[in-house]
């Protein structure tokens, strides 16, 4: 309980300074010149050409083929509402690069491969500036935890660059995301969308959050609340990617038993914090924690490994794939 109270107090303190940050956003970005339509069109053409050229990795595999003459259009996705207009998210990608924040990406030179993918997905405040050779430069979707909003605002010039057309999905406890005037995070997101009207900001609804909890219970047999678990942004991002993408290439995610090897290489938890905590130390401390609330990183990776046995998920940097099992996983994607 004390840990939860401290978590709540920390969030409240962050929210008290958010208005000041938003004013800075208004002054620095409110008058920012938009990229001319011609440049936007050229950028879109370049991205389409990159997707068409393919790469050394397998191309996207789609379960259905679009009939000639029938216009393709993404269907609305339940549970993701626009902050400004409350309209559902419409997005679909043939192939996606889900770029983790792991230190395994340092010196990987995977950037060009990532940028050739149709849609590039990133998490929280993971930067591209200065790391493009390893993690790429494009961002199609960024999934952001409520606790990372302050860091997003501090790096707004890079992370809130509306010229890329990036979609932002914010998640958080339902009490922070209420739309009745009492949801502090939602209120600030709504203000941000007014300051930056071209920002494609979406939030996960309360009902969808409950579905994410239920999915965790179905896949692990553990109740999230009873087990004192906070779902990680990686959990939300992987599940969202399964809804959006026909194929998912995951960069920087280790297999669930990686940290058991006493000779595993030591890498930073975040590639952009080279002197930060060790990745396996972070994973193990959260997995074993019982008092307070923790992320169950290794448990989540076991689920992802299991999904990859059936669904079109592939892991790179490090490269690995799950061993086959005699019993097949159900062929329906774990979404609601």
Curated annotation (Swiss-Prot):
Stretches in topological domain Cytoplasmic: 1-8
Pfam families associated with the record: Glyco_transf_29
Reactions accelerated catalytically: a ganglioside GM1b (d18:1(4E)) + CMP-N-acetyl-beta-neuraminate = a ganglioside GD1alpha (d18:1(4E)) + CMP + H(+); N-acetyl-alpha-neuraminosyl-(2->3)-beta-D-galactosyl-(1->3)-N-acetyl-beta-D-glucosaminyl-(1->3)-beta-D-galactosyl-(1->4)-beta-D-glucosyl-(1<->1')-N-acyl-sphing-4-enine + CMP-N-acetyl-beta-neuraminate = N-acetyl-alpha-neuraminosyl-(2->3)-beta-D-galactosyl-(1->3)-[N-acetyl-alpha-neuraminosyl-(2->6)]-N-acetyl-beta-D-glucosaminyl-(1->3)-beta-D-galactosyl-(1->4)-beta-D-glucosyl-(1<->1')-N-acyl-sphing-4-enine + CMP + H(+)
Enzymatic class: transferase
The keyword Repressor belongs to this UniProt entry's keyword annotation: no
Location in or out of the cell: Golgi apparatus membrane
Name of this chain's protein: Alpha-N-acetylgalactosaminide alpha-2,6-sialyltransferase 5
Originating organism: Homo sapiens
Gene: ST6GALNAC5
